[in-house]
């Protein structure tokens, strides 16, 4: 049996190349209106992305509202009221990574709930940052 509009309960959106155009590096106005229409119909809308919430604040317009956000590839999920789920990397794994970085340094980003840190940046990191339009 084919799915009807009434069968749709939720819609999940990626950020890069879905909400944000790779060409214009912005969310089209038509997308903002379409998501608002979905929400008016009672359809839940979610962002599912590898990005950090800090980046979403910079990239998504304030007028674009979602019911919840699944960030960092599902490692940090929240809505407007609460954090729903977190999956931090175990401390032993972090210690192992720091040892590897001491022995063989390479650019690495460390992410907390509220901040992002990088041990150092090189030309490749700068190029990737430009490509994904994030600071």
Regions from the PLM with identified roles:
Residues 23-27, 82-84:
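Short, solvent-exposed loop/turn segments at secondary-structure boundaries
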Residues 5-8, 42, 66, 105:
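A general structural motif
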Residues 27-30, 90-92:
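Charged helix-capping and loop-helix junction motifs
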Residues 51-69:
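Substrate-recognition/cap helix-loop segment adjacent to the acidic, metal-dependent catalytic center
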């Amino acid at each position: 049996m084919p799915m009807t509009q009434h069968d749709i309960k939720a819609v999940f959106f990626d950020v890069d190349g879905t909400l944000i155009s790779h060409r214009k590096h912005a969310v089209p106005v038509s997308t903002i209106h379409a998501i608002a229409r979905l929400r008016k119909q009672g359809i839940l809308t979610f962002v599912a992305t590898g990005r950090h919430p800090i980046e979403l604040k910079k990239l998504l317009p304030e007028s674009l509202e979602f019911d919840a956000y699944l960030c960092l590839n599902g490692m940090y999920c929240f809505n407007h009221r609460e954090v729903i789920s977190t999956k931090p990397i175990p401390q032993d794994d972090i210690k192992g990574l720091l040892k590897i970085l001491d022995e063989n340094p390479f650019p690495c980003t460390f992410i907390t709930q509220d901040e992002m840190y990088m041990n150092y940046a090189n030309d490749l990191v700068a190029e990737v940052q430009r490509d994904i339009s994030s600071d």
